[in-house]
C-alpha cells in the first residue's frame, strides 16, 4: 500500500525571506520584460532605456533594473551618476532601498531606476564571483521599494550567463526582447539568446533590430551600413515576433551625453521607431493577457 509521506519540518528548507519578498513584489508588477542580447555592442541598454522612457511617455508606471552587475550603465543613460541611495528599515530588521526616480521635467510618468552604477564610482570595477552577483541581483529585485508598476524592465548583460538564470528562476517573465544588429555575427548569437528564452518558457519573445540603417543627413538616402533585413529574417526563422527596426541616429550621442533617452530628445527617426515599438509591445502583451484596458 502506498501512502503520502509526511511533510518534513527541517530547518533551512523553507523559502528564505529574500526569495519571499521577491515573490510578493512581483505580484505588483503587471508586466515583467527582459531585454537581452546574444553579444555585446548591439545597443541593448540603449533599447532598454528608450523602451522604458517610451512606455513612461505613454503614461505607464515603469521601473528599470540594471542586471548587468559588472558593466552597469543604465543609471548614467538616465542622467543619474554615483549617488546616495537611501533605505527604509522594516519591523523584521531588513532594509529596502528607495530607487531614484526621473521624469525629465514632467515629460514622462516618474521612472524608478536601480543600478549598481549608482553605488560605485564610474572608474571602479566590480570584481565579483557568480555567487555574489546572484545575491546582488536578488537584492535588487527583493530589497528595493519598487511598489506598483505597469512594467518592470530588466536590462540583462550580454550573453546567456548566470545573471539571466537568476532572474528567470526568481520571477515569472512575461516577455523577452532580444536585441540584434543586421550583422551576421550578431545574428548568430541572437539566435542562441532566443532559444534560451524558449527553453525558459517565456510566454512572449520578440526581436528588435538596432542600428538598422542610417539616414544620410545631407541627401536623405537610407544607408544599410551593417547589412539589411537580418533581424526580421532571424525572427521569422525562430518563429518569434519582429517588433521593428531602430535606425542609427546622429542625435543619439548628443542625447546620451546629456543623460536623456533619444525618445525624449526631439522628433528624430530613432525616437519615432522606439515609440512605435513600445506601442506594438503593449498591444501584443494586452492581447496575450486578454487585457483590453487602456492606460
Curated annotation (Swiss-Prot):
Which family is annotated? Belongs to the Mrp/NBP35 ATP-binding proteins family.
Protein name per its UniProtKB record: Iron-sulfur cluster carrier protein
* Keywords for this protein: ATP-binding, Hydrolase, Iron, Iron-sulfur, Metal-binding, Nucleotide-binding
- Which superkingdom, per the lineage? Archaea
Q: Which GO terms describe its molecular function?
A: 4 iron, 4 sulfur cluster binding; ATP binding; ATP hydrolysis activity; ATP-dependent FeS chaperone activity; metal ion binding
Chain sites annotated for binding ATP = 38-45
Q: How does it assemble?
A: Homodimer.
Q: Which SUPFAM superfamilies match?
A: P-loop containing nucleoside triphosphate hydrolases
Keyword Metal-binding part of the UniProt annotation: yes
Function, please? Answer: Binds and transfers iron-sulfur (Fe-S) clusters to target apoproteins. Can hydrolyze ATP.
Checking HAMAP family in the record gives: Mrp_NBP35 (MF_02040)
Q: Could you give a single Gene Ontology term from the biological process aspect?
A: iron-sulfur cluster assembly
Keyword Acetylation: yes or no? no
Can you name the source organism? Pyrococcus furiosus (strain ATCC 43587 / DSM 3638 / JCM 8422 / Vc1)
Amino acid at each position: 500500500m502506498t501512502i503520502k509521506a509526511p511533510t518534513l519540518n527541517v530547518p533551512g528548507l523553507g523559502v528564505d525571506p529574500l526569495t519571499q519578498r521577491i515573490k510578493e513584489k512581483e505580484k505588483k508588477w503587471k508586466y515583467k520584460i527582459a531585454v537581452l542580447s546574444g553579444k555585446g555592442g548591439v545597443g541593448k541598454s540603449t533599447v532598454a532605456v528608450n523602451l522604458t522612457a517610451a512606455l513612461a511617455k505613454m503614461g505607464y508606471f515603469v521601473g528599470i533594473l540594471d542586471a548587468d552587475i559588472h558593466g552597469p550603465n543604465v543609471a548614467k543613460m538616465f542622467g543619474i551618476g554615483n549617488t546616495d541611495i537611501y533605505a527604509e528599515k522594516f519591523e523584521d530588521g531588513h532594509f529596502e532601498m528607495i530607487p531614484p526616480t526621473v521624469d525629465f521635467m514632467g515629460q514622462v510618468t516618474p521612472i524608478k531606476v536601480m543600478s549598481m552604477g549608482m553605488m560605485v564610482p564610474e572608474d571602479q570595477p566590480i570584481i565579483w564571483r557568480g555567487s555574489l552577483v546572484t545575491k546582488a541581483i536578488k537584492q535588487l529585485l527583493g530589497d528595493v521599494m519598487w511598489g506598483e508598476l505597469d512594467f518592470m524592465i530588466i536590462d540583462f548583460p550580454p550573453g546567456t550567463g548566470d545573471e539571466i538564470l537568476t532572474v528567470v528562476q526568481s520571477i515569472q517573465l512575461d516577455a523577452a526582447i532580444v536585441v540584434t544588429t543586421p550583422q551576421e555575427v550578431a545574428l548568430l548569437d541572437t539566435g542562441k539568446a532566443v532559444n534560451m528564452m524558449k527553453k525558459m518558457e517565456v510566454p512572449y519573445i520578440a526581436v528588435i533590430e538596432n542600428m538598422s540603417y542610417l539616414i544620410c543627413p545631407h541627401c536623405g538616402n537610407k544607408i544599410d551600413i551593417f547589412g539589411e533585413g537580418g533581424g526580421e529574417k532571424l525572427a521569422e526563422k525562430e518563429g518569434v515576433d519582429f517588433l521593428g527596426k531602430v535606425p542609427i541616429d546622429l542625435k543619439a550621442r548628443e542625447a546620451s551625453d546629456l543623460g536623456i533617452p533619444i525618445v525624449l530628445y526631439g522628433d528624430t527617426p530613432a525616437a519615432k521607431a522606439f515609440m512605435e515599438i513600445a506601442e506594438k509591445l503593449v498591444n501584443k502583451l494586452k492581447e496575450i493577457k486578454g487585457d483590453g484596458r487602456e492606460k
